[in-house]
């Protein structure tokens, strides 16, 4: 309707040329809460039941629980809902990147239909890691064109990244999160006590996303990881010592606040230059091609190592800063190189990211430690030179683990 006369009806509805055309403008107010709580399944803790409303006599909830979480916490979860008189159906789902697909999503929809949730007053509840939260978030966004839901992340990467934003999605056609929506959970409850049963590798996996925030916006957070990273790995954010507890609380708060601070003004990604995309230019392709060898945070760390080298070669970092970054990656027991990093793979990854970012690279690079800039001119030759140096630095820094590299993603 550009260039035509619009008549305002004072209600957000406009008509043109004696009602031969209309323009409707509407806004939707979005708010959601992220809350830190220790021990959310204690009987006296009612945070999980605040959303929605009960039906006469008894409230009802449909709960999706990760299969590993169910093994460790299933009895406690069921006892909690029984204690509060909640009629709940618990669906146990195996969730990993290979099962993050439409088939898993539609299985959940089938079970929701069988349970018969009320559209608005019986929010879905998801308890699990980032993969399961992404799937259930997508289901919630599509079910009856939008159902409320509550998230309880049980992994570190869920607490600091996947559980605090609004993205949902599943993998499709070999691409990570190719199908998805922007749908906030009504409430996210972050309980670090779940991390006590997480294996060491998955603590490191989440620390990679914390390191991302540190490198692009928070030098003090980087210094905290530099000083306390091994303790956080050892104590799994449980605060077994007074110093470890202070570090765990401070690092979690800084990482979550930093992420939300970046998301809030650009929640729907109208602006495609996003500093929180640091580490996510090459990693989606690298992660999918390396499945199941690399976890998400590990792929992000490999990406950050590559872009750290690119930044150093461009004079955005000193050699000392570059080496500090690689040293922290090693201290957090994260990989800083992987054999999948063939130059052709990286070029293909960058091309796909350019399409995702609407025709430009919009590649975030660290400026010093705690700053960021965006570039659009990285070349295949530059990638090849950078990954060669990355391999030299990564081979020297990446810890050689002898134990199981798998583990439960609770």
Swiss-Prot record:
One of its GO terms (biological process) is antibiotic biosynthetic process. The keyword Metal-binding applies. It catalyses: D-sedoheptulose 7-phosphate = 2-epi-5-epi-valiolone + phosphate. This is 2-epi-5-epi-valiolone synthase. Its EC number is 4.2.3.152. The lineage of its organism: Bacteria, Bacillati, Actinomycetota, Actinomycetes, Kitasatosporales. Catalyzes the cyclization of D-sedoheptulose 7-phosphate to 2-epi-5-epi-valiolone. Involved in salbostatin biosynthesis. InterPro entries: Dehydroquinate_synthase, DHQS/DOIS_N, DHQS_C, EEVS-like.
